[in-house]
Amino acid sequence: MTKEFHHVTVLLHETVDMLDIKPDGIYVDATLGGSGHSAYLLSKLGEEGHLYCFDQDQKAIDNAQVTLKSYIDKGQVTFIKDNFRHLKARLTALGVDEIDGILYDLGVSSPQLDERERGFSYKQDAPLDMRMDRQSLLTAYEVVNTYPFNDLVKIFFKYGEDKFSKQIARKIEQARAIKPIETTTELAELIKAAKPAKELKKKGHPAKQIFQAIRIEVNDELGAADESIQDAMELLALDGRISVITFHSLEDRLTKQLFKEASTVDVPKGLPLIPEDMKPKFELVSRKPILPSHSELTANKRAHSAKLRVAKKIRK
């Protein structure tokens, strides 16, 4: 891992080991990031195995081309610079119509958070950006300065689950009427000013939920995850597995619901046997989400909210 792209991988062994890797299998890392999961997965593949890695951040791919060089030289890795919502189309174009396993590490990566100019962090002053793909058009600046009041309230409440969404949106509306809100610090201060004093005494930064909400809107994170996970589940071969790491309740709720729908069936009352074509296509590998160990939590504070869910395809 290069110094410019330092990222501590969360739930490394659990996420990959739960995929039950076949040495000659075809696998996908839908969120390459710092390439930690990819490197560990590749170490389990034989010469016939292959890994397809997706990331919309060119810096992540540039970093992986260094850290995964030995596997690249053996022709075991293919990098795809794209949003993982296009996963099915991109894989199909490469002649891949079935995979043995796939993993997702959802949310923003540590290097993106730590790189000041990306504008993801409320702790560092930077232009309002928050794009995971630097070539996409919508930025946090546009959301904050051009979205109508009601849209801001909806986004803050839906994606940030902040009970002061209206007050914050009103404060933003008043400020931008005087001049555009241009930096993360300006926005964070407005959010703080919109909240009552007793709220500011609570643990955690007062701007955290709103920054999350804007980031999700800018990158359409939940829409992309929904599309991609459903497509991935279709692509899985029989006995193929999918591992999904989430970092907040919205991502976890989405993943849990998709897995539940695929692993359960509504059987009409009184039906003695479930017809084959009505049986669920998936089963949960673990009923409850897998959480980081105590030692991992001690070593990496960013792992504290991580949850891993895994499902296995049992019927085509």
From Swiss-Prot:
UniProt entry keywords in alphabetical sequence: Cytoplasm, Methyltransferase, rRNA processing, S-adenosyl-L-methionine, Transferase
Record-level Gene Ontology MF annotations: rRNA (cytosine-N4-)-methyltransferase activity
Catalysed reaction equations from the record: cytidine(1402) in 16S rRNA + S-adenosyl-L-methionine = N(4)-methylcytidine(1402) in 16S rRNA + S-adenosyl-L-homocysteine + H(+)
InterPro entries linked: RsmH, SAM-dep_MeTrfase_MraW_recog, SAM-dependent_MTases_sf
Subcellular location: Cytoplasm
Enzyme class: transferase
GO process annotations (BP): rRNA base methylation
Residues that, per the record, bind S-adenosyl-L-methionine: S35, G36, H37, D55, F84, D105, Q112
EC number: 2.1.1.199
Highest taxon above the source species: Bacteria
One cellular component (GO) term of this entry: cytoplasm
Entry-linked Pfam families: Methyltransf_5 (PF01795)
Function, as annotated: Specifically methylates the N4 position of cytidine in position 1402 (C1402) of 16S rRNA.
Family from the record: Belongs to the methyltransferase superfamily. RsmH family.
HAMAP family per record: 16SrRNA_methyltr_H
Name of this protein: Ribosomal RNA small subunit methyltransferase H
Lineage per the UniProt record: Bacteria, Bacillati, Bacillota, Bacilli, Lactobacillales
